[in-house]
């Protein structure tokens, strides 16, 4: 299927990241996950497969076309009972989830980079103590290391990485899997 995506297939998480997410879910005994950014559902499906039978995953995305692709994959893998999709801008969905007093063991962020800081701060409020916030694309093809590179998204990710590094609410590490994952543990 990925070959049919053309240039946008680069938005897909790497297989190594899927394996890592599954490992983290299993060793942490996580049961409730929020994903910000569904795309075609690879990461959501990978995480759902690692959840126990009573686990659940909510995934947020505003794109109904890619959401249809994702939900078709969820059904084929018999995971549709564990996965709930919400189709609207992620910040709107996050605010609703907060008002409903939802809490999560893990939040995985892989969505529009302009809102990474907003997603991070809002999601952190819904993570249980010692819960994990995992963010994708933090190495941004290695471009964040080039201080001379001031391309819009490179700068956004570089500034986001600095913000997270200085955040006293979490303990964090960057792993060079795929396009880079930041793993934050809520203190």
Regions found by a protein language model. Give the residues of each.
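A short alpha-helical cap/connector motif
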Residues: 1-108, 113-134, 138-187
